[in-house]
Every structure is written in C-alpha cells, then in structure tokens.
C-alpha cells in the first residue's frame, strides 16, 4: 500500500493513466479507471494531471475497500468494525479499542506479511484513516515508530507506537518530548498511551495509559 495515494492528491502523466498491463506495479491507473480518482487539475508546463478523490464518500469507500486485504476482517464486517472503533474512542473506552485493534492483526500468517513493519504501519494507517472521517486524527511515522493524536469532543488521545521497543519506552517518549504540552489548557480528558508491537507474536503486545 502506497499510503500517499490514499492520503492526498497525486500527480501523473496522461500515458500513465491510460496504461494498464499485467507487468505494471503502479496501482494508480487501475484506481483512476475504476472511478475512485478524478482529475482535479492540470500542469501544462510539465504535462502532469493532479488526481484526487472527488469527495469524502468516495475516499472513505476506497479505504474501506482496502481494509480486508490488510487486516483480519471480512468485507461484510469491515464497516461495522470501524463504527465500533469510532464509538469506543468517542466514549473513552481505549481498552476495547486496543483489543479490537489486536484482533485485526490476529491469525495473519507469516507468509502474508512480507515486510512486517510495513504491514503493521499499513493496518494502523487504514484504521486511523477511517476513524479520521469521524474524529480528528494526526498520524506520523518515522524509523520504527508511529505517533498519533486523536481528538473527539470529550477526549484527546496521544499515542506512541514502538515497533521495536516497549510500551514503557513509548510512554516515556510522550512525556520526555512533551507531546501533551499543546493541550495543557484543554478541558477535555487526555490519555497518554504507549504501545508496543511484538515481532514474535506479530501483534500489539501491551499498552500503558496515563490519564490527565
């Protein structure tokens, strides 16, 4: 999954948009010709088309379509699972949220996961991208770690995910780097959550929470 193609507009030349063959590894022409992407602009100087999702409904539908291919959830259950995620973060039930997230990684065979770290990041990206249609989400990745800020009307979640480390280290980083400082005067309840991913079990192993 190229997360940039699911996160923002992309630029492609016309010959790329019209070229689909069995040897091509570029998903953009297929996505474009399937109707998920539309032309939003054209750069005459470089002959590049700017592509993007025509509206929120189409973008959400596309990301929902991806979910069963990356997580342990079937196509029928997928929309309902995301609804449960959203309800849990809106109600402050982070334990149920993470148990549900664990189930998304369960029973995924080692053969399916060619790049374990990339697979983990892709699943998290898709889940939080979908949750982001209903709550404010800021998501960043960098060298084996993911930091996330998720906001609802009543709650703020600051999460640090360690792909090679401990939940304690993840929570310590939130505190050491003062990730919660911008929300110091916010009246909403704040959760600082450190999470680690186990290479042995290929799943979320532990999460630690500090509440404000």
Give the predicted meaning of each segment.
Residues 182, 186-212:
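Domain-level recognition of nuclease-like catalytic cores that cleave nucleotide substrates
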Residues 52-83:
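Short, amphipathic alpha-helical interaction segments positioned at domain boundaries
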Residues 34-42:
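A short, conserved structural fragment
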Residues 127-153:
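Active-site metal-binding core of divalent-cation-utilizing nuclease and nuclease-like domains
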Residues 1-7, 11:
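Single conserved hydrophobic/aromatic residue that forms the stacking wall/gate
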Residues 163-180:
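Mg2+/Mn2+-dependent nuclease catalytic core
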Residues 103-136:
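Acidic-basic catalytic patches of nuclease active cores, encompassing PD-(D/E)XK
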Residues 124, 148-163, 177:
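Conserved catalytic cores of phosphodiester-cleaving nucleases, focusing on short active-site segments
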């Amino acid at each position: 999954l190229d997360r940039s193609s699911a996160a923002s507009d992309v630029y492609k030349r016309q010959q790329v948009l019209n070229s689909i063959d069995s040897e091509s590894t570029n998903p953009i022409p297929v996505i474009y010709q399937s109707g998920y992407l539309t032309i939003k602009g054209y750069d005459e100087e470089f002959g590049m088309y700017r592509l993007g999702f025509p509206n929120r409904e189409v973008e959400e539908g596309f990301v929902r379509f991806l979910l069963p291919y990356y997580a342990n959830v079937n196509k029928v259950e997928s929309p309902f699972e995301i609804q449960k995620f959203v309800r849990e973060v809106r109600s402050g039930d982070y334990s149920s949220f993470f148990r549900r997230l664990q189930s998304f990684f369960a029973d995924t065979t080692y053969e399916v996961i060619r790049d374990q770290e990339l697979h983990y990041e892709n699943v998290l990206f898709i889940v939080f991208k979908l949750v982001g249609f209903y709550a404010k989400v800021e998501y960043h990745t960098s060298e084996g770690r993911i930091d996330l800020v998720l906001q609802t009307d009543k709650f703020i979640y600051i999460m640090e995910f360690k792909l090679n480390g401990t939940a304690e280290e993840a929570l310590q980083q939130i505190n050491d780097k003062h990730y919660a400082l911008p929300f110091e005067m916010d009246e909403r309840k704040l959760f600082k959550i450190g999470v680690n991913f186990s290479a042995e079990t290929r799943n979320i192993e532990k999460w630690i929470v500090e509440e404000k």
